[in-house]
Amino acid sequence: MIEFVYPHTHLVAGVDEVGRGPLVGAVVTAAVILDPARPIVGLNDSKKLSEKRRLSLYDEIKEKALSWSLGRAEAHEIDELNILHATMLAMQRAVAGLHIAPEYVLIDGNRCPELPVPSMAVVKGDSRVAEISAASILAKVTRDAEMAALDIVFPQYGFAQHKGYPTAFHLEKLAQYGATAHHRRSFAPVKRALGLVS
């Protein structure tokens, strides 16, 4: 990881999101406070890890972290608020769910939600800050599992493969079968499938 200079505080939470780009399902966030006495080897951006390694780290993070929490904003909230505001809301929910209050929050990306504690956005934080990497892994494994579950209910869309992202296959099936109740109606490809835009 590129060296990151931590704020002078003890209880640092890392926050990341997964699922801003997909056309279906929730945006899922996680907040993690790691335990310095129980280091976790191999934390890295969850997108760069194999699925097997991610699943192994997911269990280890949940076991060793001082506190962890998941947050989410559902498809209907994304449609009501827009994806940016829904993501900020989901991040607030993840931080609020921590059973230990952090002294400082580090958030992946370039903007922070309003929080009751000091926070800082860290560009490429998922590959620079261990707490954000851990949050990224929890959020991704959780959302991927939700897409696999949705795939069982709607096998024709291939959600387990593309995780709801707008792949050519997903767009083809959206045009063929229309949108499910889980699709984000404010996203242009879904609007087109519903005949809401030409």
UniProtKB/Swiss-Prot annotation:
Enzyme Commission number(s) from the entry: 3.1.26.4
UniProt domain RNase H type-2: residue ranges: 10-198
Top-level taxon of the source organism: Bacteria
Annotated localization: Cytoplasm
Any one GO MF annotation of this record: RNA-DNA hybrid ribonuclease activity
This protein's UniProt keywords: Cytoplasm, Endonuclease, Hydrolase, Manganese, Metal-binding, Nuclease
Entry's cofactor comment: Manganese or magnesium. Binds 1 divalent metal ion per monomer in the absence of substrate. May bind a second metal ion after substrate binding.
GO CC field: cytoplasm; ribonuclease H2 complex
Residue sites binding a divalent metal cation per the record: D16, E17, D108
Catalytic activity: Endonucleolytic cleavage to 5'-phosphomonoester
CC cofactor: Mn(2+); Mg(2+)
GO BP of this protein: DNA replication, removal of RNA primer; mismatch repair
UniProt key word Glycoprotein: no
Transmembrane segments: none
Gene3D superfamilies listed in its UniProt record: Ribonuclease H-like superfamily/Ribonuclease H
NCBIfam families associated with the record: PRK00015.1-1 (NF000594), PRK00015.1-3 (NF000595), PRK00015.1-4 (NF000596)
Role of this protein: Endonuclease that specifically degrades the RNA of RNA-DNA hybrids.
Family of the protein in this entry: Belongs to the RNase HII family.
Record-given protein name: Ribonuclease HII
